[in-house]
Structure formats: structure tokens, C-alpha cells
Amino acid sequence: MFNNLKPAIAAFALAASLALNAQAAEVTGAGATFIFPAMSKWSSDYNKATKNKINYQSIGSGGGIAQIKAGTVDFGSSDAPLKVGDLTASGLAQFPSAMGAVVPVINLPGMKAGQVRFTGPLLADIFLGKITKWNDPAIAAVNPGVTFPDLKITVVHRSDGSGTTFNWVNYLSKVSLDWREKVGEGTSVKWPAGLGGKGNEGVA
């Protein structure tokens, strides 16, 4: 983990849109995978206190937004906040329910936690596919004294509509003009490099 990058890529507050159906014996929701562990605990506590159930499906922020707009669930959750115009047009309310951070991690044999450092532009170049080897001079330049193997870098990212993706590419767009012009921002982008996994569990 690269702790020095945490403040720069802190996630937006999770936005939850609530449809008015408070009398339902079972409340249904869908959306961000990021909040699923907390949602599971809240659902359990809510059930103990009220005897009512919350059925939350962690299908990704994009799916949650689509379902709450379609009216197929009582609430949706997304790491990427909706704009005021979008909320008004859909008749939705939005409020923050949790906050988290997106932190890049690596799986490189022989490296200790916190040993490898990156800059924002360097991360952008890796995700753009411009830097493909661990022993690239650009990586070595910001990691003096660290010897990197001649191994290919395999980038892993979300394949589904994701608030985690939104937060990550929003950061890359701020630190890299090349990323901003070629890829841009959104809950779903055309990734220049890497393998896609569905949900945070798929990436892990």
C-alpha cells in the first residue's frame, strides 16, 4: 500500500438515494460494492431493532443508480455523487452515508509493505500502458535503493460500472493531462491496459 497517496485520492462521500417506502417489511437496495461490509452490519442491526429486513445487492455503483432510477429498489448507493439536475429529473434525494479511500496495492515478490513509492503521474502512465515493466527507469527514479525485477506489470481494474473507478480515474485526470485527454472520468471508462474484475471482490 502507498500510504503517502491516501490524502490525494480520498473518495467522495458515498451517495445514497432513498425512495419513500418506509412501511415495507423488506427494504431493497442495490449499488456500490465498497459499502457492502458496512451495509451488512447496518442491515443486521436494523433487523434486530425493527424485525424488518434490508436486502442489499452489491452490484456496483452504476447498477445501483440504474435500479433506483428505474424504481426497482427502495434505495441505491454510489461512490460517485449524482448531479443536482440528475437528482431532480429522477425525483431522488441524496445524502452521504460513508466515506472511504482508494489506495493502490501491488503484489510483487520480495517487496515489503510501504517499500514501493509512486507519484500520481507515474501511476497514470502505468494505467495508460506506457510503463509495462517493474524495472522501468521511471519507477526506479522515485524509489532510490530499491532493486526491481524484470517482470511485466499486470494492471487490474474494475470491469463494471463502479464508484471506485470514478474516484480512481478522477484522481488520475487531476494528475495527468495525458490521462484526462485520452481516457477521462466516469464510473465506467475504456481502460487502455489491464485486466477487469467485477466488483471489488473480483479485483481482489
Which sequence ranges carry the predicted segments?
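Hydrophobic helical h-region of N-terminal Sec-dependent signal peptides
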Residues: 5-22
